Amino acid sequence: MQKNIIDELTWRDAINQQTDADGLRELTEKKSISLYCGVDPTGDSMHIGHLIPFMMMKRFQLAGHHPYIVIGGGTGSIGDPSGRKSERQLQTMEMVQHNVEALSGQMKRLFGEDANVSMVNNYDWLSKISLLDFLRDYGKLFNINTMLAKDVVASRLDVGISFTEFTYQILQSVDFMHLYKAHDVQLQIGGADQWGNITSGIDMIHKIEGSETEVYGLTIPLMLKADGTKFGKTAGGAIWLDPEKTTPYEFYQFWLNQDDRDVVKYLKYFTFLDEAEINELAKTVETAPEKREAQRRLAEEVTRFVHGQAELEGAQKITEVLFSGDIKALDVKEAEQAFQKAPTVEITAEKKNIVDFLVDAGIESSKRQAREDVQNGAITINGDRLRETTLEIDPSENFEGKFVIVRRGKKKYFLARVK
């Protein structure tokens, strides 16, 4: 028997707070509901931190409920103060619109073009509210003392908060009200820092529609790694869903390298594997951690969900090739993914003696050092270890003549591009 969606989320430890646990469980058992989660277009790509609430939305979708994804073209032009220590820099409306289109495309890839999901932009209704209507119809329902007590505002009082950001919780409440009246949306989902905004919306709906109105709020836990640091950030920055910002190979590697202490939690949050499968993988973490079976399955599932089967297979191939050293097995696209972070140097297309090639590219500082490294076996060209200083390098032989991959020593790679 299939679990109720609330029970499913509970065993996955995916719920932080909810306004009425029993009421929401009962509602989701007796009918298919509509629910929503919003994302403001502060950039042109989501990162993996955004995946957490939207994985929850996907679970509701698979359980037969109807998610509404709200792209905040209106609220994004104002700026959400949640989780911020300082005022956001306002974006131009052109930039907001560009980001709206980019995020909408990502959402369609995650949820499917024809699936039981709706994409809406809150600019469509917020932009139609005049200032006088906003103050009379909505502002009158909000008590300043209550607003000041919300964590999102209280945490900013010492450094200051603009009236613009102060009113953000009202705008988010208007979103919930609009979606409830227009589409019978009864549940809002958000991150842990959205609790105050979500409860403000519920309070407003109760004031307008009556206290018995069945609307609910649910937040996800703040995601921290076992070492106490914030999930989703690396030394190189955020892990993006856009393959142009974070390649599928880098994305796959991020999940593959997760700590044993975190991997079971992430399997619950970020995959659709059932309880029995996750429990089996949890056992392997205890009995054979060196095999990293749980990490490999996590990387496979999340990369497939975000980037698709073909990109997953490409990431796996790159991983295997870099381990074996058979670099020529990669095609041009795969090689560029694999060595995207390697230093890039420029070379010409003509054949050159290996010593001259290394010095002219700036990989070696002198011909003497180049000869020494070649003779000692410290140089590989496109995966081949070369020891003869008389050899010639022909850039046209591999990778469509676009580049040569050079390794000096055990780990130092260079991407030598033909100019």
UniProtKB/Swiss-Prot annotation:
Domain S4 RNA-binding span(s) in chain numbering: 352-419
Gene Ontology MF: a single term: tyrosine-tRNA ligase activity
Reaction(s) catalysed (UniProt annotation): tRNA(Tyr) + L-tyrosine + ATP = L-tyrosyl-tRNA(Tyr) + AMP + diphosphate + H(+)
Single biological process term from Gene Ontology: tyrosyl-tRNA aminoacylation
Motif ('HIGH' region): 41-50
Keywords assigned: Aminoacyl-tRNA synthetase, ATP-binding, Cytoplasm, Ligase, Nucleotide-binding, Protein biosynthesis, RNA-binding
Cross-referenced InterPro entries: aa-tRNA-synth_I_CS, aa-tRNA-synth_Ic, Rossmann-like_a/b/a_fold, S4_RNA-bd_sf, SYY-like_C, Tyr-tRNA-ligase, Tyr-tRNA-ligase_bac-type, Tyr-tRNA-ligase_bac_1
Gene3D superfamilies registered for this protein in UniProt: HUPs, RNA-binding S4 domain, Tyrosyl-Transfer RNA Synthetase
Compartment(s) where it occurs, according to its Swiss-Prot or TrEMBL record: Cytoplasm
EC number: 6.1.1.1
Pfam families to which the protein is assigned, alphabetical: SYY_C-terminal, tRNA-synt_1b
Motif ('KMSKS' region): 230-234
Protein residues bound to L-tyrosine: 36, 168, 172
Group of enzyme by EC: ligase
GO cellular component: cytosol
Annotated ATP binding sites: 233
HAMAP family, per database record: Tyr_tRNA_synth_type1
Role this protein plays: Catalyzes the attachment of tyrosine to tRNA(Tyr) in a two-step reaction: tyrosine is first activated by ATP to form Tyr-AMP and then transferred to the acceptor end of tRNA(Tyr).
Similarity remark: Belongs to the class-I aminoacyl-tRNA synthetase family. TyrS type 1 subfamily.
Quaternary organization: Homodimer.
Protein name, per record: Tyrosine--tRNA ligase
Source organism of the structure: Latilactobacillus sakei subsp. sakei (strain 23K) (Lactobacillus sakei subsp. sakei)
